[in-house]
């Protein structure tokens, strides 16, 4: 497989044609913010936070789904991109009810971390104050759709890793939401295996364990890389991750 060379933020880097700009950037210590991306899941380019500028392209490109090309010159942190990212975080904040002080994921929330990172102190766009359905019918878990940012991590991990495909997206525009099966109560879902993978990969407090209180819902996603690596090698070995 041919090795391609390119430049990211003035730094010469290299990779293969099957790698994305996000892959290569992170391999070389260049941090590009994301919300929908998660190692082990297929990328969909939903959050648009990883948009980058590529010289010669008239539009911004999502780093998570853009494959390498020889001679690319990429910029990941220009003033234009900083404005775009701040605006995206503002819109995500305004479209939901994100009350950090009383959220189970306070201080463990990726959206909150990004808000700090982009310097978001106030939101310039009007809040929409949605009133979507909170579903606590499951024995162990709760989904608060007002905190959902539609990253689809839960949909993808349920489909690609667990193989259940309990979650999907229904509706359009501001009415778009995550639903279980044919828009039924989560607790009555015949396909849900109660594995909890969707809860662990959720970047906000939209999915959480019953009984969790303020700032207690610390998520972890390392298990996903472990499972994917073990399946790829067809070997269940606790040391697999250390070898990656």
Where are these regions (language model features)?
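N-terminal cofactor/phosphate-binding cores enriched in small/glycine residues
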Residues: 13-70
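Eukaryote-biased recognition of intrinsically disordered, low-complexity regulatory segments
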Residues: 1-9
């Amino acid at each position: 497989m041919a090795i391609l060379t390119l430049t990211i933020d003035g730094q010469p880097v290299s990779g293969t044609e099957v790698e994305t700009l996000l892959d290569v950037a992170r391999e070389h210590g260049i941090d590009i913010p994301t919300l929908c991306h998660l190692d082990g899941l297929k990328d969909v380019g939903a959050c648009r936070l990883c948009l980058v500028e590529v010289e010669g392209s008239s539009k911004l490109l999502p780093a998570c789904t853009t494959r390498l090309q020889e001679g690319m010159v990429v910029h990941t942190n220009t003033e234009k991109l900083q404005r775009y990212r701040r605006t995206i975080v503002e819109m995500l904040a305004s479209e939901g009810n994100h009350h950090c002080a009383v959220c189970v994921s306070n201080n463990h929330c990726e959206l909150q971390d990004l808000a700090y990172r982009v310097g978001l102190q106030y939101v310039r766009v009007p809040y929409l104050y949605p009133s979507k359905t909170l579903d606590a019918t499951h024995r162990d878990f709760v989904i608060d759709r007002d905190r959902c940012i539609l990253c689809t991590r839960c949909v993808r991990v349920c489909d690609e890793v667990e193989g259940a495909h309990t979650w999907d997206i229904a509706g359009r525009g501001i009415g778009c939401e995550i639903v279980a099966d044919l828009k039924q109560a989560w607790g009555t879902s015949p396909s849900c295996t109660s594995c909890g993978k969707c809860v662990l990969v959720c970047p906000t407090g939209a999915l959480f364990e019953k009984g969790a209180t303020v700032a207690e819902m610390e998520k972890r996603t390392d298990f996903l890389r472990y499972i994917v690596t073990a399946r790829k090698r067809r070997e269940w070995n606790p040391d697999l991750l250390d070898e990656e």
